[in-house]
């Protein structure tokens, strides 16, 4: 099997061949740290986290770089409004970003450079562009002259003439072309600045990623990722300035994730549907958010709504439910090595599903990281495994039946972990779910446990009318009770 990825640059799916065999150099544009991160940031972070995990699963040695933009107009405005400095604002929101990412199970990249710590490299690239006559100084600012770069527009598929005709760029008489973009901004009162050959100032946004990508990964590297909103102008401008300066291709494969809509509308503060990651995690389990993101192909748009999150929640609960049932009813005792014939004899179809999962999972993920299809493969095995368990009613499984069930559960979990899913024990996930969802009932966990204990006592006393009354009373408040040989469990909804 061979990994294929969709390359935005060529508009086609291509075999992935890294520059150096066995090694992958991978850069993703990080957040601008002036506010809390939103659900769109969560999608991008989760998508590229899974790509990072899968590349390592395939055996690649991956160097993953994701930057922080910690100097920007928005950060400056936020600092001025708060009566503090840009560094304090950036540090506050970097810390908040890490908290959100840790909750979502997003691995830390290998390197996370700050833009402010890489300004000398940005100045050097601008100096090269000036020396080549591709950049020009206008007042205290320095601009990139797009007409000096013949390939401008090749990533986004736009023609300069068409862009000019439909341009909604602010008119700046200093520019030679309205689409020329800033490389260096002359200093203004109250703004951070660095010394440069063109006077004190700060870098433009686009030059930051070119400098950090080339510093840590080389002048040409394998993968550059980000949201589709970054294709133009940010990534287009990165290509132009990098290739003009270095004289070689900047990136081999450009990967872009799709947008997140809220109830089928574009997310925006003006529409009042802007959701921070923290807003969402007040009500939704972080692993459910992750499952939701991965249930669609990364290039497709996704719609975030109560309905779609509810579907993700049910799907994740099904997987955990089956794993929990195996753990409860097929617990490993004295390990025995069963022959294939004995295991297959328990359920040939389940045995074959377990054996086929690895290949099916690889086939899905090798097809441009198709996590939706990969999850479908996990659910196919989960359904067969649950049917197998159901054949035994509530009995404990023994011998080869127990071994087969555990093999199925292990296969599901091992492959889910590549996606960063099923990272908890089933009972821990269920407890976390209850803690989140009980808020909507007005009850506390202690009150539910007290009701269960009173009902248990009533049943023990053979006062079944009282036991039924207690059950009906708590179910009216949205709590479902499930009796089992191990005791009574409860869930919300």
Swiss-Prot record:
Binding site for ATP: 269
InterPro entries cross-referenced by the UniProt entry: Cys-tRNA-ligase (IPR015803), Cys-tRNA-synt_Ia_DALR (IPR015273), Cys-tRNA/MSH_ligase (IPR024909), CysS_C (IPR056411), Rossmann-like_a/b/a_fold (IPR014729), tRNA-synt_1_cat_dom (IPR032678), tRNAsynth_Ia_anticodon-bd (IPR009080)
Pfam families: CysS_C, DALR_2, tRNA-synt_1e
Catalysed reactions, as listed in the record: tRNA(Cys) + L-cysteine + ATP = L-cysteinyl-tRNA(Cys) + AMP + diphosphate
Alphabetical list of Gene3D superfamilies matching this protein: Cysteine-tRNA ligase, C-terminal anti-codon recognition domain, HUPs
An example Gene Ontology molecular-function term: ATP binding
This protein's record includes keyword Zinc: yes
Cofactor names: Zn(2+)
Subcellular location: Cytoplasm
SUPFAM superfamilies: Anticodon-binding domain of a subclass of class I aminoacyl-tRNA synthetases, Nucleotidylyl transferase
Residue ranges of the motif 'KMSKS' region: 266-270
EC category: ligase
GO terms under biological process: cysteinyl-tRNA aminoacylation
Subunit-structure text: Monomer.
HAMAP family for the chain: Cys_tRNA_synth (MF_00041)
Name of the protein this chain belongs to: Cysteine--tRNA ligase
Organism expressing this protein natively: Syntrophobacter fumaroxidans (strain DSM 10017 / MPOB)
